[in-house]
């Protein structure tokens, strides 16, 4: 039987940039290793052309921010804020064992807002 070899992970790209409205308050927790974890829900709505037809696009995704570098940024995130998130997608299992797609944040930018420092990136 001919088996397929797994793809080389260095050739697989996983990046997503999504702009939307914050629809929940930021929740904070801590990993067993003591790493701060933050999360909130982002709702995206737009119109896109597909096969010469305009399509209304909508999605709601949980945004995850892991690490101390996000502690100040998350204090500024409020319900209704428009943000641009760049990061990677990953599957999380909830308490019922159901899988859901989440967006792990690498960069966050406030859009059309009077926020200090404009674009906010995690510090290295």
UniProtKB/Swiss-Prot annotation:
Instruction: Supply the InterPro entries for this chain.
Output: NA-bd_OB-fold, Primosome_PriB/ssb, Prisomal_replication_PriB
Keyword terms = DNA replication, DNA-binding, Primosome
Q: Name one GO molecular function term.
A: single-stranded DNA binding
Keyword Signal present in the record's keywords: the answer is no
> Domain SSB spans what residues?
12-112
Give start-end ranges for the coiled-coil region(s).
none
An example of a Pfam family matching this protein is SSB_1
Q: Does the keyword DNA-binding apply?
A: yes
Q: Which GO terms describe its biological process?
A: DNA replication, synthesis of primer
Any single GO CC term annotated in Swiss-Prot or TrEMBL for this entry: primosome complex
Q: Which Gene3D superfamilies match?
A: Nucleic acid-binding proteins
Family as reported in the entry's similarity comment: Belongs to the PriB family.
Q: How does it assemble?
A: Homodimer. Interacts with PriA and DnaT. Component of the replication restart primosome. Primosome assembly occurs via a 'hand-off' mechanism. PriA binds to replication forks, subsequently PriB then DnaT bind; DnaT then displaces ssDNA to generate the helicase loading substrate.
What does the UniProt record say this protein does?
Involved in the restart of stalled replication forks, which reloads the replicative helicase on sites other than the origin of replication; the PriA-PriB pathway is the major replication restart pathway. During primosome assembly it facilitates complex formation between PriA and DnaT on DNA; stabilizes PriA on DNA. Stimulates the DNA unwinding activity of PriA helicase.
For this entry, the protein name equals Replication restart protein PriB
Which organism is this entry from?
Haemophilus ducreyi (strain 35000HP / ATCC 700724)
Primary gene name:
priB
């Amino acid at each position: 039987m001919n088996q397929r070899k797994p793809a080389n992970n260095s050739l697989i790209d996983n990046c997503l940039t999504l702009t939307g409205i914050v629809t929940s308050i930021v929740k904070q927790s801590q990993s067993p290793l003591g790493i701060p974890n933050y999360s909130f829900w982002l709702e995206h709505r737009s119109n896109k052309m597909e096969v010469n037809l305009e399509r209304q696009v909508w999605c709601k995704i949980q945004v995850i921010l892991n690490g101390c570098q996000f502690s100040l940024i998350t204090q500024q995130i409020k319900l209704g804020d428009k943000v641009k998130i760049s990061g990677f997608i990953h599957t999380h299992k909830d308490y019922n064992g159901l899988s859901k797609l989440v967006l792990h944040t690498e960069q966050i930018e406030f859009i059309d807002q009077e926020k200090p420092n404009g674009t906010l990136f995690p510090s290295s």
